[in-house]
Amino acid sequence: MEESAMKKFRLLALVLALLMVVPFVASCTDKKDDNTTTAADSKGTETGDTTSAGDKVKGDIDPADAVDHKDFTSVYDMIGSKVTIDMVTEDEEGLAWVTVDGVKYELGMDFLSMAMVYRTDVPANSEKYKTADDVYNEWWKLYIQRWNYLVPEIPLYSNQYFDLYNAKIDGFVTTPYWGPADAIVAAKVTTADNSVILGSATDLSGSFRNSSWGKSNPGSSDLDIQNLTSGYATIMTNKDGSYSWNEGVVDGTPASKVNEDGTLTFTIKIKKDLKFSDNSAINAKNYIAALLSNSTPVGAAAGGSGTAGQTVVGFAEFSAYDGTNDGKEVGDKNKVTATKFFKGVQLLDDYTFAVTYTSDYAGYYYSIVNAGFSPDPLPLYLGSEGAIVVDEATKACGLNDAFYAKVTENGAETYKVAGEIVANMKWNSALPYSGPYVVSNYDDNTHTATLKLNPVYPGDSFRGKASIATITYVKLVDETQMDMFKQGQVDVIAGITGGDATKAALKIVNDNPDKYKETHYDRAGYGKLGFRCDFGSTSFASVRRAIMLTINRNEFAQTFTGGYGSVVHGPYYEGSAAYKAVKDTIKLNVYTYSVQSAIDELVDGGWIYNEKGEKFDAAKDTVRYKKLSGYELSSDNLKFKSTDGKYSVIKLDGEYYMPLVVNWYGTQPNDVTNQLVTAWQTAKAAKDIGMYITYTSTEFNPGIYGELYRMEENGYDGTPKLNAINFATGFTSAVYDYAFNWTLNQNLYNDYNTAHLMDEADFYEKYTK
């Protein structure tokens, strides 16, 4: 599957939504100190060292003292194929274990997320598990319980979403899975102007052709524009989030076949009358160009992941090919024979292609999404001279020599096509679009995009045929968006949340029912405090749990939503089938506000020292410290310091101590940020537990993409700083799949591991030493 489709159909989730939390049964209790060995914490009791300050000598930080992981082999890679759900046991804390070949393994986030969608085979003669759904639901429960234990982010509120719109728009309906970009295509305007202005508080960045390119997650506004300008996907979602074949695109139902070697082949034939916005014809090559390109070093050099086809047969061999080494053995640790042709990607004729998935992924629970492909203009991913070539004997596809051609730029050799891909990704490149609309203009200063109706696009089975002539997409600010709406400067404000904003929106509708309308739904997701879980204090689960315990989340949610929301305790939507199936047995820590419980977590995690390496004394010491050991001594951790320069990792008598500092970036303007300043950063509870929190105001793109995801093009300067940032996450699809989102694989880590959490339980070396 191409990267944009994979992100859309699998990762999809950085803007999650609300659910009204039903009361939990007795299993939803506050957990006491956790004694598992999973978290990256060195356990301790609050005794500290009794030596005087004069006995400890302060030294310089030595990068040579860093201890970084070298072996990223995962438990799932080694034993995943041997494990069935009936082999798994659950301890009283809700953590999962399995014994294989005499070795007992704790199942980490990577294992559980992969097993949840790839190990749903029903055990033979099982009384408990009768269907793949039963197996999936159990894996899902164990995954949620571990997430709840490790706390990679803190759900702050789960609310109702209100979408406010001008009454001139008819048929505008939204759901947790059917956002404004889909709803506006299906809607009509009843006035002569036939135009609509959409608004969003999330900045546009201009990444409209593939909003996921080079990112772990797409910006929600960029994704809206991509959805409005993209069409002819082989599968689509409907209003309830479920997937179906796009009958206007596929010529007959695509065939799926499990082969003798356990691999799975999808064969897809598309119709012959599909056209881009410039009237150029679409054929099968347009559907596989991105998959091929972004499985090569050229795609990676252009900012892609280079791993789009990682689950397809022959990926390792094809991705190793660089245009010069066909048939040669390459690689140091894992040697493969490079090949020009991608064995698992076949072009059968001009309108038919086939993709074969490896046996490891053939049993995918949501198998239909593996057949999800969208067409792209060939130059977008192949450049002006690149082309798809076919092995006549096998029908396997590859890319021509021109695609791999190199040039010298600034004294360095690089792929020529990589630069073309970067240029072609821009909204105003000469390439056509495939969907209901085309981008006619984008103003980077005001973050405003103008879209015009694509008369060539015939519509689809789900959204129908678009009829609104012009859509303008503008930047909104909370403080002024209601005034803009009443003045006609915006026609749709989507995702209104928060008590004051919701009440203001409803008042506008109630005062002018003939002029304004609203639609609302329970949000499938939540606003959150997200963490960078591989750097500084927030790389420790004990710290993340302590933060969870010192934010009164129930009070926060009620204050922010004005009673139009509540709190959830993990990444789930109470309206989902999986949650409903396990809600009576799931074990969740609700993290009731408690300073003492937070202190207990920190003490248990080894945060028991002061800046002198002595026992922390709350009566006279301000900030706790932790003595680092093992992989806690990572290269980045040795550089950790507060953004204001007051605190940093110190070296005393050859031992390293980390301060309990959290560098928080708050997006502005944002009511959640303002509330967090009061409820968390400057609250007495933070001081009481010995935590120091810095606050840096940021805009969305430099905060999320620059500091959290460390993308230089968004302002990252090469020095890690951020520990926490508030934004939102959402389940915008009925497909709940977080496979690869917790990967240890360093080739995938930056593109897929959105929380940057490497669960120590997932490292295979942990069980072999």
How should each PLM-predicted stretch be described?
Residues 53, 58-207, 550-585, 597, ...:
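Detector for C-terminal structural segments
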Residues 23-27:
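C-terminal motif of bacterial Sec signal peptides marking the signal peptidase cleavage site
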Residues 128-135, 252-318, 341, 348, ...:
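Aromatic- and charge-enriched surface segment that lines or borders ligand/interaction sites
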Residues 193-203, 265-269, 287, 353, ...:
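Short, well-ordered beta-strand elements
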Residues 213-231, 237-242, 340, 361, ...:
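Gly/Pro-rich hinge or "lid" segments in bacterial periplasmic/extracellular proteins
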Residues 155-157, 163-164, 176-182, 199-259, ...:
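N-terminal lobe/hinge region of extracytoplasmic solute-binding protein
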Residues 242-244, 440, 450-452, 539-685:
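Append "and occasionally in soluble cytosolic enzymes with long acidic Gly/Pro-rich linkers
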Residues 300-312, 440-456, 472-535, 546, ...:
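Extracellular/periplasmic solute-recognition and catalytic clefts
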